[in-house]
UniProtKB/Swiss-Prot annotation:
The keyword RNA-binding applies. Its main location: cytoplasm. PROSITE patterns: S1_IF1_TYPE (PS50832). This is Translation initiation factor IF-1. One of the essential components for the initiation of protein synthesis. Stabilizes the binding of IF-2 and IF-3 on the 30S subunit to which N-formylmethionyl-tRNA(fMet) subsequently binds. Helps modulate mRNA selection, yielding the 30S pre-initiation complex (PIC). Upon addition of the 50S ribosomal subunit IF-1, IF-2 and IF-3 are released leaving the mature 70S translation initiation complex. It comes from the Bacteria. It comes from Synechocystis sp. (strain ATCC 27184 / PCC 6803 / Kazusa).
Length: 75
């Protein structure tokens, strides 16, 4: 599977789960279970409930994803 096959969507983190897993509510109304990518883990970027994030999904399983970016909060 190549990077072109990935589906990238935005959503809001609803819940923090054990083992760096998060429940994310996507903008289209679906809920996914997402883990954080290696770059976010390596750079110690904190993800908290309420944060806006970008999530990559595979076309094979649309219920699981990877958080690739934490969006800036609009104030």
């Amino acid at each position: 599977m190549s990077k072109q096959d990935l589906i990238e969507m935005e959503g809001t983190v609803m819940e923090s789960l054990p083992n760096a897993m998060f429940r994310v509510d996507l903008d289209n109304g679906f809920n996914v279970l997402a883990h954080i990518s290696g770059k976010i883990r390596r750079n110690y970027i904190k993800i908290l409930p309420g944060d806006r994030v970008k999530v990559e999904l595979t076309p094979y399983d649309l219920t699981k994803g990877r958080i690739t970016y934490r969006l800036k909060n609009k104030k």
